[in-house]
Amino acid sequence: MKSKKTVLITGSSRGIGRAIAILFARNNYNVVINYNKSEDKAKELYDMLTQEGLSVRIFKADVSKIEEANALVNYTIGQFENIDVLINNAGISKPCLFTDISYEQWDEMISTNLSSVFYVTKKALQYMLPNQSGHIINISSMWGLVGSSFEVDYSATKAGIIGMTKALAKELGPSNINVNAIAPGVIKTDMLNDLSQDTMDMLKEETPLMRIGKPEDIAKCALFLA
């Protein structure tokens, strides 16, 4: 099994994570697909890729919880003996006015989008550091760079991911472990389902390519960084 590299992707049953899983599997990686609530989507993806003869596993874990994040990493090691690439993709978005953000929503956003990156990365490094090898790719957002009205909590978590990535890259570089972040613009995922057509048209006009990004665009970037 060590002849293939192994990638663990959090939140990979839908959207960007799904596209990443497909591309890596088709490029000869062992792929561990993580999901929390979207079991049907995860199984559908698993069935599709295994029917192609590809090396894929699925594992349910809420990575905002330390014990489940640890279990996910341990499962990956148990299946494939190593983690060559970790992609922290799991995240949620709940647009609303800042004054309408509840304390519970704030805590959920921080734990799901930011703390999960810490939990999974910390556990994965138990295996990467002894090998003096590895790639960590964190999925952030352009809102982590410029901020978004009605998504203050989301923007804060994505900015936190960028800060964590910069610091960790400096710390782990001497150990031959690369750490990068991808900060996508507007990508066509379920997070856009509630937007009106007028809003979508406006977003297209503000994008240099004059189109909404596709999950596959981000997957190609992740594969390049791996």
Tell me what each language-model feature is.
Residues 174, 181, 204-226:
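C-terminal helical subdomain
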Residues 29-44:
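Conserved glycine-rich Rossmann-like NAD(P)H-binding loop of the short-chain dehydrogenase/reductase
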Residues 126, 170-174:
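Alpha-helical segment proximal to the catalytic Tyr-Lys
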Residues 13-15:
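Conserved glycine-rich cofactor-binding loop
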Residues 141:
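Residue(s) in the substrate-gating loop at a strand-loop-helix junction
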Residues 121, 157, 165:
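Active-site helix of classical SDR
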Residues 97-98, 105-110, 192, 203:
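Substrate-binding pocket helix/loop in short-chain dehydrogenase/reductase
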